[in-house]
Amino acid sequence: LQGNLVFTDNFGLVNNLPIIGQETLRLKIRTPSVMSGGSFGEEQIIDRLFYINKVQGAKSVNPNVQAVAVDFVSMEGIRNNRIVVDRILTGTYSDIAKQMLKSDLKTKKTVFVEPSSGVKKIIANEVTPIDIINQCKNQAVSKENGQPTYKFFETLTGFHFRSVQSMYATESAQQYIIVENESSVD
């Protein structure tokens, strides 16, 4: 996960306690969940740690206030930029993707992997784990449905390496019914 954040600095913190791009950012977001039927349920609390990896700079809003923009990334993004893979990888593309996440990026998050077909060999020559996963994503064919439509993404529940068809196969969260007006004109 990655994103950017803009905040106002009323106290000159950016100048007095400089933000240089190596700080930890903790986002704690409270959001109501939607129950089946459309009613609101208990609030969900999203609590995640990120690392600031870029400071866009500060822009003066008025004499005592400046707006500061920072970019942030999850720990796996930081690790990905520091790790170089330089070896031969053998297995299905889904196995290789899982290996990159678990062994190389050392993620503790849940990894959802849809099995792909065929044993492959990748000669990694000084590339990042995410580069290898993206290569696997572009070439993988689903073992279950034979489709080459893999996607790789991260959600709040973990990392996903799966085909578009498997995402379509999940049950709908809501159903929408269109009712036509049955009035007749004589």
Language-model features, listed with the residues they occupy:
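Assembly/oligomerization scaffold segments
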Residues: 1-82
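Short, cationic low-complexity segments
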Residues: 28-33, 94-99, 183-186
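Short secondary-structure capping/junction motifs at helix and strand boundaries
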Residues: 35-39, 44-45, 107-111, 144-149
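Glycine-rich, acidic and aromatic/proline-enriched surface loops and short helix-turn segments
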Residues: 65-79, 90-110
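Second-shell loop/turn segments in exported
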Residues: 14, 81-90, 118-124
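Short beta-strand-centered interaction patches in the first periplasmic/extracellular domains
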Residues: 67-69, 74-76, 111-186
